Amino acid sequence: MEVILLERIENLGFMGDIVKVKDGYARNFLLPQKKALRKSKSNLEYFNAQKVELEALNLKRKGEAEAVAVKLDGLNLVMVRQAGESGQLYGSVSARDITDSLKAEGFVIARSQVLLNHPIKDLGRYETRVSLHPEVIVTITVVVARSEAEAQASAAAAAALLERPEDAEEAVANEEEAEAALLDDEDADEYEQG
């Protein structure tokens, strides 16, 4: 089915483009959400008549999205979750959880705007994209930790890595040496007991 796009759609086209899409995609997504019109002579005339208004509306939405993007870009969200010894979560962190945390921070974001390919299932720091407008996409950092203190330690380590990468590498090397020494001591204790 050929449709006329009423707004920019990622991986498809820009406003006013006539594109060929699968019938189901048009009927189930583009047409109901008023993101496109079926291609016909009357719809082409309608689009050309409304083009200036649609462009003005699109610019207004883009401006609003950019205003939110300034506040949201680079935000660190802390998600406290229970996890096993290996760092694997007992549950997961999904787009819904991220949306709920953003709402608690005062942002009005729909779940579909959080671009998360798969749920987060391990502790750590994750870069996540949020699409505020088809042309405005920001990146936030989701920190998944067992506690607030662990999240702050992770944030401090990441900040140290950004400020002085050579010091961070040295800190990681020292941490690995200390861990290896601890394991060697445990092995020696087991040998003496055995």
UniProtKB/Swiss-Prot annotation:
**GO-annotated cellular components:** ribonucleoprotein complex; ribosome
Q: Bias category Acidic residues: which stretches?
A: 166-194
Q: Member of which family?
A: Belongs to the bacterial ribosomal protein bL9 family.
Q: What is this protein called?
A: Large ribosomal subunit protein bL9
GO MF annotations in UniProt: rRNA binding; structural constituent of ribosome
Keywords from UniProt, A to Z, are: Ribonucleoprotein, Ribosomal protein, RNA-binding, rRNA-binding
Give the organism the record lists.
Rhodospirillum rubrum (strain ATCC 11170 / ATH 1.1.1 / DSM 467 / LMG 4362 / NCIMB 8255 / S1)
Q: Could you tell me which Pfam families the record lists for this protein?
A: Ribosomal_L9_C (PF03948), Ribosomal_L9_N (PF01281)
Q: Record keywords: rRNA-binding included? A: yes
Q: What ranges does the record give for the region Disordered, renumbered to this chain?
A: 165-194
